[in-house]
Amino acid sequence: MTRTIVVGLGRSGLGAARLLKQQNHDVVVFERGNNEALQHTSKTLAEEGIQVVLGQPLTLQSFDAWRDNLDAVVIGPGIPWDHPTLVQLRSEGVQVRGEMDTAWDALQQIPWIGITGTNGKTTVTHLLSHVLEAAGLTAPMGGNIGLSAAELACQIGSGAKPRPDWLVMELSSYQIEAAPAVAPKIGIWTTLTPDHLERHGSLEAYRAIKRGLLERSECALFNADDPDLRQQRSSWNRGTWVSSEGAHPDNQPADLWIDDEGMVRNNTTRLFAADVLAMPGRHNRQNLLLVTAAALEAGLSPQQIADALRTFPGVPHRLEQLGTLAGASVFNDSKATNYDAAEVGLRAVQGPVVVLAGGQTKQGDASGWLKQLQSKACSLILFGAGADELASLAKAAGYPGELLQCPELESAVNLAEGAVQRHQASSLLLSPACASFDQYRDFEARGEHFRTLINPLLDEA
């Protein structure tokens, strides 16, 4: 029997190990950590016939005792594809695969909708799964959100979940890079701005990874309102382009757009009013169009799509409205982990705004975000590891409003209560513009903490 080594006991690693075991592989898991929680997980996996080696770093020496019958090494998205150990293993003929690749092997007979982009992909994934399910189809979402692709494959393979009509998969650049075989029935590209450059090295490399997914997709859908995608349009000889800016954005024809009267339409007919989706912001009109194009491709009628859009509850941590504080609308936008996403969130809410931002800063162009701050923010409250860096950026840009700093989110919320009242703000917005890893497991944990902190302060309904 050949052996597969899975690296890492995160959600993707766990899913991959169980999926491979379900397929009768001899599976060993390497995990560099060793704590009580990992020991508990290790014991559970051992009972399932999966061996775990804790305290095992990703080095060539770690593999020495396991080379006999080694068929493949499977990694999760948190491990760089070009890690020196993986590069060396590949040069020695060892197959290195991403967790997403193992799931594709198991699930490729089911049509995939693969959704990628710097920003917008989570909202599109949630919204599209909702629309398809509301029309009576089985269309679970997973990948970069919710269940990992391998976990979904396990549940479908075991019969715990019914065989889906569609799989709605959010795909990050890390996942795409390590799964070059994934070829969706429908591919969606939401936006492209500089992100994860510390991992991919350049915008060109980052773009090429995402482009590969769309090139392999049977049907490719693009957001024509995105400046980078629009600039690359002439390099595509196929695809459906959507625009919230009318029929001819930048003098290029759109295939699906919102007209001057607020109607979603294509080249032959008006479909429905764009205001069926209650979520604020121009970016959500773009999301609506991408979802509509995909749903039409999947065989839904305009009426089915419109009915489903009316009932969409929104996405947790993405401009999620939590209530009001001293009359100001409170938004949890913890998913805004870079400057571009934070700029989009700030554009979407009513000013004057009290903004909470901070965390682990990323490379990127902050100019658009800073411009929105100058225009709409009455108070900027910075917290976490990146507070000093963000404060320097704001001062250098000439931000004219109140600027406060504190060590963590709890202090920021306390300051925000006073700032809302002091400035008679219309909105209070957590939109960090940073990753969460300085103080939180992920952006969801940060958003949940914000919800816990702000709930006691909210006005009574």
Curated annotation (Swiss-Prot):
Record-listed E.C. numbers: 6.3.2.9
What compartments host this protein? Cytoplasm
| Keyword Oxidoreductase part of the UniProt annotation | no
Chemical reaction(s) catalysed: UDP-N-acetyl-alpha-D-muramoyl-L-alanine + D-glutamate + ATP = UDP-N-acetyl-alpha-D-muramoyl-L-alanyl-D-glutamate + ADP + phosphate + H(+)
Mainly resides where? cytoplasm
A single Pfam family it belongs to is Mur_ligase_M
User: What does the record give as its pathway?
Assistant: Cell wall biogenesis; peptidoglycan biosynthesis
Q: Which GO terms describe its cellular component?
A: cytoplasm
> What is a single molecular function from GO for this protein?
tetrahydrofolylpolyglutamate synthase activity
UniProt keywords, alphabetically? ATP-binding, Cell cycle, Cell division, Cell shape, Cell wall biogenesis/degradation, Cytoplasm, Ligase, Nucleotide-binding, Peptidoglycan synthesis
Q: Which residues bind ATP?
A: 117-123
- GO biological process: any one? peptidoglycan biosynthetic process
Question: Does Hydrolase count among this protein's keywords?
Answer: no
Q: What does this protein do?
A: Cell wall formation. Catalyzes the addition of glutamate to the nucleotide precursor UDP-N-acetylmuramoyl-L-alanine (UMA).
Please give the family membership noted in the entry: Belongs to the MurCDEF family.
Protein name (record): UDP-N-acetylmuramoylalanine--D-glutamate ligase
Gene label: murD
